[in-house]
């Protein structure tokens, strides 16, 4: 995939306000830790995550996305009528039907000819949305579009902790550990063809993207509902973290080779990378496998955890705000999502 007239003009975000430490979660798991003689502090030691953020109880997902969207509109000064598409891409959503994007679009006051829909692709949702909007722009169908997402980890972590205490086995502990890394946040990305009179000067050019998949591994990480009684369902999430990391790194290596060849880049020509945020071990193994020096990557998982689809774009926004990403940098967005899918974007910052 190659693009010649697609630009990212805003990466606006909203962080959830409730800070939850790893030690706080461990205190709730004290009976399990005592049974297996696990010392306190292991969650942070194993993941590198000391805290994450959650939305308040009763928070509606689309509210977070709406707030981020308003920030993006304020930053760019874009006329909402120019948005040819609004796509919501979170793993979490308000309901099955209608599309969560509909409430967000209504709050923004978009025009009647705006395409409004949801896209779902595990933690790669926002990247999938970016490419979907980019294709529309490159084809000349629209001049601008917005990708929005909001993720919430509170409910699934609470359910998981209850399940870990009710079924205190080492296998259940291992399959549940990844869930405890979940964080919460929202993001809005505005893309244009570069022709609109915006008030900001941000204009990061999307150059191209590569995507490879390994769907035979679709069972390694699952989040959904399971029947626990007659017409009684409970949310669950389980992850084979060891195998997921192994197969994810292998897929990332092939995608990286494809990406560099398509862009005609050497690995040394990639100035900075922004990765989906999972944890310390994942970061170390992925960067090592791709021969990327750690100083070229900007981590946020230590204080934000894994925010699903929101992690990578929020990390990019923070990296920009803190001067890590500079004008002219050749930047790669690197994402691996359950399924397995791997997606990499090339951007001239």
Curated annotation (Swiss-Prot):
Disruption phenotype: Deletion of the entire oleABCD gene cluster leads to the complete absence of nonpolar extractable products. The oleABCD deletion strain shows a significantly longer lag phase than the wild-type strain when shifted to a lower temperature. Gene3D superfamilies: 3.40.47.10. Its EC number is 2.3.3.20. SUPFAM superfamilies: Thiolase-like. It catalyses: a 1,2-saturated acyl-CoA + an acyl-CoA + H2O = an (R)-2-alkyl-3-oxoalkanoate + 2 CoA + H(+). InterPro entries: ACP_syn_III_C, Thiolase-like. The keyword Transmembrane does not apply. GO terms for biological process: secondary metabolite biosynthetic process. The active site is at 97 (proton acceptor), 123 (acyl-thioester intermediate). Belongs to the thiolase-like superfamily. OleA family. PANTHER family: 3-OXOACYL-[ACYL-CARRIER-PROTEIN] SYNTHASE 3, ACYL-COA:ACYL-COA ALKYLTRANSFERASE. This is Acyl-CoA:acyl-CoA alkyltransferase. The gene is oleA.
């Amino acid at each position: 995939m190659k693009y010649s007239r697609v630009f990212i003009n805003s990466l606006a975000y909203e962080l959830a306000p409730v800070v939850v430490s790893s030690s706080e979660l461990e205190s709730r798991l004290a009976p399990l830790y005592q049974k297996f003689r696990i010392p306190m502090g292991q969650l942070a030691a194993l993941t590198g995550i000391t805290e994450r953020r959650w939305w308040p109880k009763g928070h509606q997902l689309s509210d977070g996305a709406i707030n981020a969207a308003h920030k993006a509109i304020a930053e760019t000064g874009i006329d909402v009528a120019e948005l040819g598409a609004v796509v919501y891409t979170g793993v979490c959503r308000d309901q099955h039907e209608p599309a969560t994007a509909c409430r967000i679009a209504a709050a923004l006051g978009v025009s009647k000819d705006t395409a409004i829909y949801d896209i779902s692709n595990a933690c790669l949702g926002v990247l999938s949305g970016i490419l979907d909007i980019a294709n529309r722009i490159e084809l000349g169908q629209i001049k601008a579009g917005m990708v929005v997402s909001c993720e919430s980890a509170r409910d699934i972590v609470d359910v998981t902790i209850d399940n870990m205490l009710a079924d205190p086995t080492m296998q259940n502990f291992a399959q549940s550990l990844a869930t405890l890394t979940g964080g919460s946040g929202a993001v809005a990305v505005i893309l244009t063809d570069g022709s609109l009179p915006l008030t900001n000067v941000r204009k990061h050019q999307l150059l191209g993207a590569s995507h490879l998949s390994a769907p035979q591994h679709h069972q390694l990480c699952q989040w959904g509902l399971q029947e626990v009684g007659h017409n009684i369902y409970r949310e669950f999430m389980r992850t084979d973290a060891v195998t997921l990391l192994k197969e994810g790194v292998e897929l990332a290596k092939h995608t990286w080779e494809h990406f560099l060849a398509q862009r005609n880049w050497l690995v040394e020509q990639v100035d900075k990378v922004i990765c989906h945020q999972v944890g310390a071990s994942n970061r170390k193994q992925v960067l090592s496998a791709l021969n990327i020096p750690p100083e070229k990557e900007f981590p946020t998982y230590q204080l934000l955890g894994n925010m699903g689809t929101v992690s990578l774009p929020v990390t990019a926004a923070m990296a920009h705000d803190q001067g890590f990403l500079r004008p002219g940098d050749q930047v790669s967005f690197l994402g691996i999502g359950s399924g397995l899918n791997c997606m990499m974007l090339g951007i001239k910052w």
